Amino acid sequence: MTWFIDRRLNGKNKSMVNRQRFLRRYKAQIKQSISEAINKRSVTDVDSGESVSIPTEDISEPMFHQGRGGLRHRVHPGNDHFVQNDRIERPQGGGGGSGSGQGQASQDGEGQDEFVFQISKDEYLDLLFEDLALPNLKQNQQRQLTEYKTHRAGYTANGVPANISVVRSLQNSLARRTAMTAGKRRELHALEENLAIISNSEPAQLLEEERLRKEIAELRAKIERVPFIDTFDLRYKNYEKRPDPSSQAVMFCLMDVSGSMDQSTKDMAKRFYILLYLFLSRTYKNVEVVYIRHHTQAKEVDEHEFFYSQETGGTIVSSALKLMDEVVKERYNPAQWNIYAAQASDGDNWADDSPLCHEILAKKILPVVRYYSYIEITRRAHQTLWREYEHLQSTFDNFAMQHIRDQDDIYPVFRELFHKQNATAKD
């Protein structure tokens, strides 16, 4: 009997290669579908999988077919509407073709719905954050902060003699020799029993005894030819270098929770910060996040309180900037950390406080951070805070600001702020 052993690395997902090829081929259509779908999700459901739909015409495969020209004769059984040389037009109407449900009703016409398939959570997040990076990440400092330590990582079939594992190699040798000689040993045992019976019987069966002795000798020779150790048995201790946990960057999240921020505006701010958190945790291993909520007073909070606390009040934006400056001086030396900040507000601020925000950012924060992003979530006209920040944008290259009017703007603005083209290292 012949046995086939499937040694493919993705044996349990035999269509994985085809799936990955499909995702690469139609990446543009899939990313467009994802960017439309993310705005329809709830705040707590941003990181799950997604059903993606692609128009059928976008996934049509190239094919060989006869050209429209030339002379051809065909027989269509049961035809009573057309005669020779008539050209059959494609039916028009809402009955087929788009699958979008926007056409008019029709009694004829046919087509295909959009192609819909499910992508996993990992595929969804990979496509969601593709081509994004922390801007101005200081690569030379990142290498200084990253330390690698050697750790045992199982066994490997290749290696240097100094790393050979004698015990594991002998175990493999015993298993191989047992598997290769088990059948022969059973047959040898049966022949030896038959030989003992014949040798003790009367009259002696010399020819049969000679035949059995010959077969026994051949089986023993075959068993002895199985090598005690083979290169297939050898196993070496495997070692790999793993980065020693060390923080390389810190992100400050500053969210306005004043009374002027209605629930809809707060939800949009939370969506932005959830995207930011998923992006950081998905792309970078060692990034700390500092959460700061502010109204008239600022407070450093944990992740749960940042997203779910109901505390509110007036508006003094400078309180959050002062607290961030204090935390940086206390815990994050700019010479050793890549410092980032993302601020979200509706732009409503006490008028005399906006110039103070400009001063704190210009003199204390922007000189030490790698990148500072500000998003203003409002449908109203911009106020003094936006105008003060516009002066900063024209002066500092590491300051960016964007305007969000409604929920559909969140993901495009997020990609604009953290697009990989901006991720150039500073010397």
Curated annotation (Swiss-Prot):
Residues 79-90 have a biased composition (Basic and acidic residues). Residues 92-102 have a biased composition (Gly residues). It comes from the Bacteria. Residues 79-110 are annotated as: Disordered. Transmembrane segments: none annotated. Belongs to the UPF0229 family. NCBIfam families: PRK05325.1-2 (NF003707), PRK05325.1-3 (NF003708). This is UPF0229 protein YeaH. It comes from Escherichia coli O1:K1 / APEC.
